[in-house]
């Protein structure tokens, strides 16, 4: 039904906004890879690829894709992000990792990480140590050697209620917690 689809779209939008508010930097346009067509010596810009959220912790950059997927409820691998999303994250990561301007901005020791953030209910899932964030695995491709961190997209579940309770933009403790989990 289209009513159910509209509700889902609204919830997906709210999920993306909550993730961006808690973890993301405000001005992320710099991090959007751009493309263009050249036709008859005239450049025609395409719309940018736009990652949901860019998180910074120390000198590292984390490209976060908020996925309002039901894996956190079902545990079914069919409910995880597909190849198009995985490949897009790798593209974002490669762009940030290889563009000189980002090394200038974040330093030579900058590392780039990728993660999908999906909702779950920590009370229903009986998490060890009552964790509000849980790493469930990582997605990789067969067209990269997966030697770079950004080529391995981490699958992270985030407790919906605890995320909703955070009213601070760029909450530093949550950012550090998520950064550690992604890197682990």
Residue ranges: model-predicted function:
Residues 21-33, 56-60, 98-102:
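Secondary-structure boundary elements
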């Amino acid at each position: 039904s289209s009513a159910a689809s509209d509700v889902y779209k609204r919830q997906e939008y709210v999920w993306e906004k909550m993730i961006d508010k808690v973890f993301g930097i405000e001005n992320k346009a710099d991090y959007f890879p751009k493309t263009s067509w050249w036709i008859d010596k005239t450049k025609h810009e395409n719309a940018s690829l736009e990652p949901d959220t860019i998180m910074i912790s120390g000198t590292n950059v984390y490209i976060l894709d908020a996925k309002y997927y039901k894996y956190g409820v079902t545990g079914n691998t069919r409910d995880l992000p597909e190849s198009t999303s995985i490949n897009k994250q790798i593209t974002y990561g490669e762009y940030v990792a290889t563009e000189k301007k980002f090394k200038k901005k974040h330093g030579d020791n900058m590392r780039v990480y990728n993660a999908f953030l999906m909702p779950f209910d920590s009370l229903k899932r009986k998490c060890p140590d009552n964790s509000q964030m849980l790493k469930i695995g990582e997605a990789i491709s067969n067209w990269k050697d997966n030697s770079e961190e950004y080529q391995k997209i981490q699958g992270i579940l985030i407790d919906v209620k605890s995320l909703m309770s955070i009213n601070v933009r760029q909450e530093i403790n949550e950012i550090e917690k998520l950064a550690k989990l992604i890197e682990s």
